């Protein structure tokens, strides 16, 4: 540290260049730093989803969930397997150690899924991995409204147009759709007609599969041109399905699907519904953010894309957002920014009152933004996000401790010196810095040691508090580095030329109050000890009555209402009880 102090004063130009580089790196890191409201507590996990519309919960667990769990069991770094088996859906969650890279975890799961597919009958669904997102990935939600449009038309528009365009936004990993009616073509067979024509249900299935497909036949050359041969037999309308030939009757007369069944456009069997604003059922879209992305930037781009999509929608169809993560993030960041700004101004005011030197106060205060920029650079390199925990824990009083000691001692040495030559000033600044270098380093180092045990926390506690400790440690380390290099240099340039290190009026008042108290305490040493012990015991009693919370409560400004009903309640009943 002594050599660093000497070099910073000897090579002042290079020190100035280093300051500029630190500022540039800090500003760039701050501009690209992931900003969110709170730390992401989601563990490293991969979700495997399987849709099995024909199965109930018991069958889903037996034929789908169990084979997937058996295939995933024993994966490297696997910590826990969880599963939920519901009507028509299996969700298996594989949780890995926090040190596991999420992409490696997904690769391991993908390799084992090939084994699981072999154990699950084809008609029971095919397992797929869920989107690469976290618990904080739900960043933007909206409803799609259009007077005169059916729920089926709105869902189709959201699924095949709006959703696909939103998935193309950088940082968006998935767009989930709730509500509406999924479009299907239903073939409702008449058993009596089947019997009269001596047909089976299997013949109907086979006819639909054979005649609802594409086929390629290569190409032919005709008049110097190459013409592709294709068999286009995909059904796009109800009439296409109705005219599929099932078999041939007597005399070779074709028997069509329409002869034995009713073909119509209808909704798929629904297992859920969505309502909004008390206006009945609607269609809802939820944008999910890619894990590790900047919520502020992603949502901003999503809103820009929504404005573009709105211009292309059919007349009367409107996208109405009802949840926007940036509103909450902006409130949190605004609170943190105001607290930091007010704290910085308060520190500058206190420094001026105690030092009695505006230049000295500004020199000390310069350590605050520079330390923050160093912390931003470290956070960017460590992959930490700026949030209420990581930024709100920074104490400006701690950041200026070293600089206060350094500046005060430099002012004392300069005021005692009668020589105003640059060489003598440089020598006095160097000597003053060396006098306080060791105790200043120990003082800041001890504070850093207090935060080191927090870095050993694991699980949810670690995800919550490790970013806070890491940010504070980086800011304190940066403040110590600045106190050794930048503060002496600024003091050499701007601290004045001797004199002016007299006690301020505030210091004299405080000294007048403190001196009698000190004499009284030294004359009666047992009384201060007894008072301290009494206050300690009183604090223990008061502390036992305080409430305990894992994290502070955050008011996002939104209400989450959960309504519990009997498991057997019908979907139509839930729809009538919408709020």
Predicted regions, residues:
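Helix-loop junctions and hydrophobic alpha-helical segments within the transmembrane domains
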Residues: 322, 333, 407, 413-442, ...
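Conserved small/polar residues in nucleotide/adenosyl-binding loops
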Residues: 577-579
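Signature of alpha-helical transmembrane segments and their immediate interfacial
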Residues: 1-35, 434-436, 502-552
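Short helical (or helix-break) motifs at transmembrane helix termini and adjacent helical loops
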Residues: 8, 395-416, 440, 482, ...
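Membrane-proximal extracytoplasmic
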Residues: 1-344, 354, 386, 463
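Hydrophobic, glycine/alanine-rich multi-pass transmembrane helices and their short helix-loop junctions
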Residues: 349-354, 372-388, 441-493, 541
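Residue-level signature of catalytic and energy-coupling elements of molecular machines
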Residues: 8, 48, 72, 109, ...
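Hydrophobic transmembrane alpha-helices and their membrane-interface caps
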Residues: 26-31, 47, 345-412, 456, ...
């Amino acid at each position: 540290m002594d050599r660093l102090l000497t070099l910073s004063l000897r090579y002042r130009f290079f020190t100035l260049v280093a300051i500029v580089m630190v500022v540039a790196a800090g500003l760039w890191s701050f501009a690209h730093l992931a900003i969110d409201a709170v730390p992401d507590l989601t563990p490293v996990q991969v979700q495997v989803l399987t849709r099995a519309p024909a199965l109930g919960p018991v069958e889903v667990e037996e034929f789908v969930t169990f084979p997937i769990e058996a295939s995933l069991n024993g994966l490297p770094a696997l910590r826990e397997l969880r599963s939920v088996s519901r009507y028509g859906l299996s969700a298996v969650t594989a949780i890995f150690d926090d040190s596991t890279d999420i992409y490696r975890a997904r690769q391991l799961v993908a390799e084992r899924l090939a084994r699981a597919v072999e154990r699950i009958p084809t008609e029971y669904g095919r397992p797929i991995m869920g989107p690469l997102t976290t618990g904080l990935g739900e960043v933007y939600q909206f409803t799609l409204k259009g007077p005169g449009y059916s729920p089926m038309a709105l869902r189709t528009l959201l699924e095949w147009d709006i959703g696909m365009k939103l998935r193309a936004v950088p940082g968006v990993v998935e767009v989930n759709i709730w509500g509406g009616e999924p479009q299907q073509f239903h073939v409702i067979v008449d058993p009596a007609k089947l019997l009269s024509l001596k047909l089976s249900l299997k013949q109907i299935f086979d006819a639909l599969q054979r005649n609802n497909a594409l086929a390629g036949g290569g190409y032919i050359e005709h008049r110097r041109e190459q013409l592709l041969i294709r068999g286009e037999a995909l059904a796009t309308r109800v009439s296409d399905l109705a005219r599929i030939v099932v078999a041939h009757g007597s005399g070779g007369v074709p028997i069509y699907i329409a002869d034995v069944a009713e073909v119509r456009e209808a909704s798929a069997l629904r297992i859920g519904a969505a309502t909004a604003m008390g206006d009945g059922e609607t269609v809802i879209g939820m944008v999910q953010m890619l894990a590790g992305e900047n919520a502020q930037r992603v949502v901003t781009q999503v809103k820009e894309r929504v404005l573009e999509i709105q211009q292309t929608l059919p007349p009367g169809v409107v996208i109405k957002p009802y949840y926007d993560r940036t509103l909450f993030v902006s409130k949190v960041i605004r609170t943190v920014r105001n607290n930091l700004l007010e704290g910085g101004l308060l520190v500058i005011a206190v420094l001026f009152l105690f030092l009695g030197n505006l230049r000295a106060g500004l020199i000390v205060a310069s350590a605050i933004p520079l330390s923050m920029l160093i912390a931003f650079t470290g956070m960017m390199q460590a992959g930490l996000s700026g949030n209420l925990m990581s930024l709100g824990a920074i104490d400006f009083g701690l950041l200026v401790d070293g600089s206060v000691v350094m500046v005060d001692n430099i002012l004392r040495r300069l005021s005692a010196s009668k020589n105003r030559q640059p060489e003598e000033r440089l020598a006095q600044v160097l000597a003053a810095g060396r006098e306080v270098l060791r105790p200043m380093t120990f003082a800041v180092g001890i504070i850093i040691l207090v935060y080191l045990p927090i870095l050993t926390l694991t699980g949810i506690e670690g995800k919550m508090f490790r970013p806070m400790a890491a940010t504070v440690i980086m800011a304190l380390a940066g403040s110590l580095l600045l106190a050794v290099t930048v503060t002496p240099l600024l003091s050499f340039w701007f601290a004045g030329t001797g004199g002016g290190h007299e006690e301020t009026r505030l210091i004299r008042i405080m000294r007048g109050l403190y001196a009698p108290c000190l004499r009284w305490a030294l004359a009666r040493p047992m009384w201060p000890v007894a008072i301290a012990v009494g206050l300690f015991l009183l604090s223990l009693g008061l502390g036992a009555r305080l409430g305990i919370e894992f994290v502070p409560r955050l008011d996002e400004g939104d209400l989450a209402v959960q309504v519990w009903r009997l498991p057997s309640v019908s979907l139509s009943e839930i729809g009538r009880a919408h709020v």
